[in-house]
Amino acid sequence: MVAWRSAFLVCLAFSLATLVQRGSGDFDDFNLEDAVKETSSVKQPWDHTTTTTTNRPGTTRAPAKPPGSGLDLADALDDQDDGRRKPGIGGRERWNHVTTTTKRPVTTRAPANTLGNDFDLADALDDRNDRDDGRRKPIAGGGGFSDKDLEDIVGGGEYKPDKGKGDGRYGSNDDPGSGMVAEPGTIAGVASALAMALIGAVSSYISYQQKKFCFSIQQGLNADYVKGENLEAVVCEEPQVKYSTLHTQSAEPPPPPEPARI
């Protein structure tokens, strides 16, 4: 209760102070209304405002519609109106329909190659390149290769280009030793394979002989060891036999002496 009373007294004192300040008419204090009201009724030279309206070049705005006209979606596109729309029936306006036809662009074909030394795949589809009765028909240009040449190659013959044609480039048929290029490589591969097989056979034979020799030495040592043990056993047993025979002989009483004969 004490807190509520103190708060109420503070609010009351603040309200009284505000009323006293307004009644005193002190214009020197800070007031937000001073920023809104004009402090002087005399306008200064710089208070004049100049308004400039700039119209879009080449564009005329359509006249305003009379009141009572219906809703027209064309009003949203007034900026694109050039002022040439005709009034429609019932106060409404219609758009002028414009039909635009777009033609397909004409493509220009590249001119045919007039050089006779260049290779052209289109020559294979030209019937004029085929031979007729052993004679070649005149060609428009390109190469001198035709279906007849393919038939000659498949039939076991060799390709013979036309004389006087071609750019004189180097071919594989010009070098008689071109077919021998692959033979040295093949011979080298076969020779290396045979050498590796021979080396493997020799090494395996040597290892087999070494193992055989080692086993033979081991068997000889075992035989000598067995023989040595047998000899030692014989030597150890013979003295015992002799000793036993001597011992038996000494155990017998000596025979009585024979009487002397006269």
Curated annotation (Swiss-Prot):
Domain of life: Eukaryota
Topological region Extracellular: 26-185
InterPro entries referenced in this protein's UniProt entry, alphabetically: CD99L2
Its biological purpose: Plays a role in a late step of leukocyte extravasation helping cells to overcome the endothelial basement membrane. Acts at the same site as, but independently of, PECAM1. Homophilic adhesion molecule, but these interactions may not be required for cell aggregation.
Membrane topology type: Single-pass type I membrane protein
Keywords tagged on the record: Cell adhesion, Cell junction, Cell membrane, Glycoprotein, Membrane, Proteoglycan, Secreted, Signal, Transmembrane, Transmembrane helix
Glycosylated residues (UniProt): S178
Similarity-based family: Belongs to the CD99 family.
Any single biological process term in GO: positive regulation of T cell extravasation
Protein name: CD99 antigen-like protein 2
Cytoplasmic side: 207-262
Composition skew (Low complexity), residue ranges: 49-60, 98-119
A Gene Ontology term for the protein's cellular component: cell surface
Mod. after translation: O-glycosylated.
Transmembrane segments: 186-206
Composition-biased stretches (Basic and acidic residues): 125-136, 159-168
The keyword Membrane belongs to this UniProt entry's keyword annotation: yes
Tissue: Detected in cerebrospinal fluid (at protein level). Expressed in many tissues, with low expression in thymus.
UniProt region (Disordered), positions on chain: 38-181
Stretch forming the signal peptide: 1-25
Location of this chain's protein in the cell: Cell membrane; Cell junction; Secreted
